Amino acid sequence: MATPYPRSGGRGEVKCGGGRGAGVPWDFLPGLMVKAPPGPCLQAQRKEKSRNAARWRRGKENLEFFELAKLLPLPGAISSQLDKASIVRLSVTYLRLRRFAALGAPPWGLRAVGPPAGLAPGRRGPVALVSEVFEQHLGGHILQSLDGFVFALNQEGKFLYISETVSIYLGLSQVELTGSSVFDYIHPGDHSEVLEQLGLRAASIGPPTPPSVSSSSSSSSSSLVDTPEIEASPTEASPAFRAQERSFFVRMKSTLTKRGLNVKASGYKVIHVTGRLRARALGLVALGHTLPPAPLAELPLHGHMIVFRLSLGLTILACESRVSDHMDMGPSELVGRSCYQFVHGQDATRIRQSHLDLLDKGQVVTGYYRWLQRAGGFVWLQSVATVAGNGKSTGEHHVLWVSHVLSNAEGSQTPLDAFQLPAIVSQEEPSRPGPEPTEEEPPVDGKQAVPADQDKDKDPQARGKRIKVEASPKEARGSEDSGEEELSDPPAPPRPEFTSVIRAGALKHDPVLPWGLTTPGDPSPALLHAGFLPPVVRGLCTPGTIRYGPAELSLMYPHLHRLGAGPSLPEAFYPTLGLPYPGPTGTRVQRKGD
């Protein structure tokens, strides 16, 4: 029989489970037995058990992360030092890269191909063997010989892959960049351009730019999400293939850039990106080239390189004397003129885009372009341009334009521009008297002026031959040294900075018009053969211009847009180009810059 509860009001305590460790206290209340709260010894046991369980879970989680890190295509010395967030980021990026690579043409997924059937266990298939040999013996050498770094972006602008050589050129880590957004490492002013190149934003309205790999221009393009996969090979150079080519310049963060070296953006480096857009899996596979260092002293100069010093408007301020070794022009004929005067018409648009990139980013590499010669033809050049500051004045800047001569003169004796035409020199016949004045002159030293009616009786052909031609710089200096002065012809006006037009001097109001135009009704002879004017030149010509320049190409920089469309020209130019002549017959209006 159970022991009755004590009748006293005191408490009784019973130790349960005696002999099996610590006892559990029980409180005996009248008619009810209540368990007492646990003591400090039991709480410590429960905490220890919880800590052991958490430690076991963390150990198992770390083991899984360690095994996952070993599956990443990274060296063991790097994968063992990764934290959990980096392992997750790199794993997700690697899965996206596998999917991105499988949709390529041809696909990159060589490791996914299993061994052929019937292969003995432990032996590798030919595909795996070739892949291993390529990675060990060729892959690293190719990356070292590229003089740049390879990267792949997805449609969101995140790095799916970037080669480890990025640390050589930018000082950034491959692990840090993989899986990160490219917009975190480029200059804020280049975000819109990268969006256009990826097709995530409509291209800005402007003159079309050929999306060529050899061009340094930033070829704008609309979204290519719905564009089908292109099956054409690169050798065919189909329009659809060229539409996916990308070539542009961006400023990326760099820990190797010296402070204050780049006048445009300190801490950034200009990278030339060339690659191809993926249409099926929208993304970009490209190669990033670093541009030569900004100081000219760090750039080795070879025999085929010519250094120019230009203004921000590409006006030649100085050039080396070795330019005469590769061209038929000397420094005296180039200084003071704009580079646009010597660029081939079909290359003017790309040079203009390179000019814009130079002013925006401070450094640029042009594509291959043709530099016109004085006697006809051209030579192929490629230039590296850098905006440099003046050591004496901090606010003044100029352009160092280093040109690589890539070929000898081609198409000699073939005029492609007006300044390449031979000068028309007025030659008087021996039987004729002295030159006739174009207007009545005041009496000099007792002589009387020739009456106007006597002037009409003279041969008009002699008057028609007298056409003012602008003298070359050498001839101009020779005439100044000799002290001779022509009373009938005014001095040649200074050449404007951004226009290049055919200059025939002040045309005289005679019955015989220049270039043999006897009557206004007769068809005008062709000044230039149609073969000398490519279609792009005819497209650049407007009724007020015969040549191209920044003003005619809508270059709307305030410090460049100084001149108008250019002076009006004789009507002999316009029938050749199929353009209406804006002025009256046989006249030429003097305008600003002429």
Swiss-Prot record:
One of its GO terms (biological process) is negative regulation of DNA-templated transcription. Residues 212-223 have a biased composition (Low complexity). Residues 453-480 have a biased composition (Basic and acidic residues). Its main location: nucleus. Keywords: DNA-binding, Nucleus, Repeat, Transcription, Transcription regulation. Residues 366-409 form the PAC domain. Residues 45-98 form the bHLH domain. Residues 135-205, 294-360 form the PAS domain. One of its GO terms (cellular component) is nucleus. It holds the Pfam family PAS. GO terms for molecular function: DNA binding; protein heterodimerization activity. The keyword Transcription regulation applies. It is found in: Nucleus. It comes from the Eukaryota. Residues 206-237, 427-498 are annotated as: Disordered. Expressed in brain in inhibitory interneurons. Also found in spinal cord. The keyword DNA-binding applies. InterPro entries: bHLH_dom (IPR011598), HLH_DNA-bd_sf (IPR036638), PAS (IPR000014), PAS-like_dom_sf (IPR035965), PAS_fold (IPR013767), PAS_fold_3 (IPR013655). May control regulatory pathways relevant to schizophrenia and to psychotic illness. May play a role in late central nervous system development by modulating EPO expression in response to cellular oxygen level. Forms a heterodimer that binds core DNA sequence 5'-TACGTG-3' within the hypoxia response element (HRE) leading to transcriptional repression on its target gene TH. PANTHER family: HYPOXIA-INDUCIBLE FACTOR 1 ALPHA, NEURONAL PAS DOMAIN-CONTAINING PROTEIN 1. Efficient DNA binding requires dimerization with another bHLH protein. Interacts with ARNT; forms a heterodimer that binds core DNA sequence 5'-[AG]CGTG-3' within the hypoxia response element (HRE) leading to a transcriptional repressor on its target gene TH. This is Neuronal PAS domain-containing protein 1.
